[in-house]
Design a protein with these regions (language model features):
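Acidic carboxylate-rich catalytic motifs and surrounding loops in phosphoryl-/glycosyl-chemistry enzymes
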Residues: 1, 73-76, 375-376, 596-597
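Alpha-helix N-cap/helix-start capping residues at coil-to-helix junctions, especially the first residue
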Residues: 1-67, 72, 81, 89-91
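Active-site-proximal loop/turn and secondary-structure-junction residues that shape catalytic pockets
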Residues: 3-5, 77, 649
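Noncatalytic, beta-rich nucleic-acid-contacting surfaces in large DNA/RNA-processing enzymes
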Residues: 36-37, 85-351, 355, 364-743
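Cationic, low-complexity basic patches in intrinsically disordered or flexible, solvent-exposed regions
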Residues: 360
Length: 743
């Protein structure tokens, strides 16, 4: 239509947005805006303007009506999956799932219940025609496994025994009696939703693999609409109205009072779309060029293309999204497990507590390396660590809120971790479920149920509803609804609440409860309880997936603390705490931590065999946060090992860290000049190394090294340029007698 605004009253806001788009002030943008601002006219006004030709409006409506169509009719299909000869996607999926079932559950005679569940799930997948989707996700997971990239499926997919058998998820849905209908059912119209967490530092490898495998024209990342927040709205409004950038920045930070006109414009911009970003992990795959369906552009990051639609637009157009998400803790776990497996084979370099750990028997299956999904179960010392809230660096349970809750919850089994992960979330907190659960957990409140039929669904959470799956179980146990209908009820009551669908399902729910002898007042109370916690209930499957990572990171902290802390430091930035705080926590547990050294450190933090006394406060980079004063749980510390801080932890060093490690392969550095010559270290980088204490292995103190850095002129970051000598550091000048740098 060419309209720039919805009504003439929005002209000022439209001008501000236009000026923002042009990156200029409104005065400068007038030439582009013109005197007339087109806007959307109301039907009555259009009729008045076309009074001489009234048929124009009716003909326009006829054309619009005839042009309308259901986008699902032209929705693209998924790429054709590669299957062996003689197989269809469905038969190949059946084969892979049953092969995985034999490995995990044994024969049908040994575990008939598991096989019955798998057959039922495969039947649903076949009826919905989603076999190709599962095969694509499995191919991505298999690629990660082949490349040594740690990944794990999570979310509602953990409710599926088929996903467990395919190796997509680590949660045994049969063992934990999870609801498949929360993930997929015959009543679902859209595709399944499988989120795959991939270690953060290697996710790009997986994304590029998907592009290469399916073709760049047939794959693209989903966009994300970034909306205005108070600060960005204030900055853009001030710039559009011609105010200096310094004033705009100050007002955005709350320093000084912005003019009324600026504040009014900023308020109008709030929550409006500002620009397009990239979804955290969504990728779309199609059997035809994506550009035939929606516009595609190049992303700022090389090698990426991005749709100009967000995930809701993609869903409306029938595009299927795959979520490849990054998770920093998976990077840390992979680093720790890889190093432990390597050290297990070296007699002179292994924690004695872990001798032979890499070939332990797990679940009675054949020998395999212990890793994220194969750790010894229900280790009491892991729960001792959690009960003491000694969880700095541990995934998901290291926040202050989690640390305050853990000693009250006192987890002693894996399901307690599942509950802990779900408990400290905005939903349960807003739904006031946290304190009732903790009171019942400690015996200070009686465990009660609105009706005995609710007990099977709520028994594990002591009568306090926490999970979305519990809503579905209540609907099936107390009212006899099918799993598919129970999932429809959950969706109708969820965050995007549909009063119409909810009322339609309420009749079935109430009738079912009446048939089972539940009186009218109790029926109403049950319905209100369901409606109340549907908004905040956390997915139990999601909590199970994260609980595995909580357990693994806790296990590493207890049994391999040096590798745990080194891996966490090597995976920064992530988590709640700074590197300095993590170092402080390691030292208070008796773990040796030595500062960066140009002759000993790798690029990232590592575990090394060290002899002699602990260097104590050698690492001073950054400021540590205060840590809880409660008791410290004993860890399996190896006195012969130490965490060596990586050169990448030296603030601002950048690519010089890799050059130093590469040059050191020819031999240790003998002097500051030798380091500068062989590793091409600039004087500014040399100063950073000196101030971090990384030159002490050369017999050079921090002040002395910083002074001498000026005499070691090397090429600067810009090619072909040299840094000038600093005053007093020219060749031939002597270093004054400098005192040691104070704390």
């Amino acid at each position: 239509t060419g309209a720039r605004m919805s009504s003439p009253s929005k002209r000022a806001l439209g001008d501000v947005l236009a000026a923002t788009r042009l990156r200029s002030s409104m005065d400068e943008a007038l030439a582009h805006l013109g005197a007339y601002r087109p806007f959307l006219r109301a039907p009555a006004e259009m009729a008045r303007l076309h009074a001489a030709h009234p048929s124009a409006l009716s003909h326009t409506c006829d054309v619009a009506r005839d042009s309308a169509f259901d986008l699902r009719l032209v929705a693209p299909r998924l790429p054709r999956t590669r299957v062996p000869g003689g197989h269809t996607p469905q038969t190949w999926l059946d084969h892979l799932a049953r092969e995985g079932a034999r490995e995990r559950y044994g024969t049908r005679e040994e575990h008939p219940g598991a096989w019955e569940t798998i057959d039922r799930e495969l039947g649903v997948i076949e009826r919905l025609g989603f076999a190709g989707y599962f095969l694509i996700v499995k191919e991505i997971v298999d690629f990660c496994a082949a490349r040594g990239i740690l990944c794990q499926g999570r979310g509602s997919a953990a409710n599926s025994a088929v996903c467990f058998c395919l190796g997509i998820t680590a949660v045994d849905a049969v063992r934990h009696n999870l609801l498949f209908e929360r993930f997929l059912s015959d009543a679902r119209s859209g595709p399944p939703d499988i989120d795959v967490d991939i270690e953060a530092c290697r996710r790009e490898e997986v994304i590029q693999h998907v592009y290469e495998l399916y073709g760049r024209e047939r794959a693209a990342q989903v966009a994300n609409v970034i909306t205005y927040r108070p600060r960005s709205a204030m900055r853009d409004a001030a710039r559009a109205l011609g105010y200096p950038a310094g004033s705009a920045q100050a007002w955005a930070r709350g320093k000084g009072q912005a003019p009324a006109l600026v504040s009014e414009a900023a308020g109008a911009l709030a929550r409006l779309p500002r620009h397009m970003g990239i979804h955290s992990g969504g990728m779309v795959l199609t059997d035809q060029p994506v550009s035939r369906i929606c516009p595609v552009g190049w992303a700022a990051m090389p090698g990426r293309t991005v749709l100009q639609w967000d995930k809701e637009d993609c869903a409306d157009a029938g595009l299927v999204k795959f979520d490849l998400l990054s998770l920093g803790m998976l990077t840390a776990l992979r680093i720790a497990f890889d190093e432990l497996r390597a050290s297990d084979a070296r007699e002179d370099y292994v924690n004695p507590h872990l001798r032979g750990w890499a070939q332990r028997q797990v679940h009675g299956r054949h020998d395999q390396p212990v890793g994220l999904h194969t750790l010894p179960e229900e280790d009491p010392r892991v729960y001792d660590l959690l009960c003491a809230a000694d969880t700095v660096g541990v995934f998901q349970v290291e926040s202050r809120a989690q640390m305050n809750t853990l000693p009250r919850l006192k987890p002693r089994c894996f399901y307690d971790i599942v509950v802990e992960v779900a408990l400290i979330r905005p939903g349960p907190i807003q739904g006031r479920s946290v304190n009732p659960y903790l009171r019942r957990r400690s015996g200070r409140e009686e465990v009660t149920y609105l009706h005995p039929l609710l007990e099977p669904a709520l028994r594990q959470t002591l009568g306090v509803p926490l999970f979305q799956e519990q809503l579905m179980r209540i609907a099936t146990d107390a009212a006899g609804l099918s799993g598919a209908r129970a999932d429809q009820l959950r969706r109708a009551m969820g965050a995007k609440r549909s009063p119409e669908r909810m009322e339609a399902l309420k009749g079935d729910l109430m009738a079912g409860m009446e048939e089972r002898g539940i009186d009218a007042p109790t029926r109403e109370r049950i319905f209100e309880q369901l409606k109340g916690f549907a908004d905040f209930g956390f997915p139990e499957s999601h909590s199970f997936s994260f609980a595995h990572i909580v357990y693994a990171s806790s296990w590493l902290k207890v049994h391999a603390p040096e590798h745990f802390y080194a891996a966490i430091l090597a995976s920064q930035p992530m988590g709640f705490y700074s590197p300095a705080t993590l170092v402080q926590d390691a030292r208070r547990h008796g773990v040796r931590v030595v500062g960066p050294s140009v002759n000993d450190s790798l690029v990232d933090a590592s575990v090394q065999r060290m002899e002699g006394a602990d260097t104590g406060e050698a690492y001073r980079e950054g400021r540590a946060q205060s840590l809880p004063t409660r008791g410290v749980v004993p860890l399996d510390v190896d006195s012969d090992l130490a965490v060596c801080i990586g050169l990448s932890q030296v603030r601002g060093l950048g690519a010089a860290a890799e050059r130093i490690v590469a040059a050191r392969r020819e031999g240790a550095f003998t002097s500051q000049a030798d380091l500068a010559r062989r590793a091409h270290v600039s004087s500014s980088d040399m100063e950073k190394l000196a101030m971090a204490g990384a030159l002490e292995c050369l017999g050079v103190g921090r002040r002395e090294g910083a002074w001498a850095a000026g005499a070691l002129a090397q090429p600067s970051a810009r090619a072909g340029q040299w840094q000038p000598f600093l005053p007093g550091t020219e060749v031939g000048s002597t270093v004054p007698d400098l005192p040691s740098l104070s704390e």
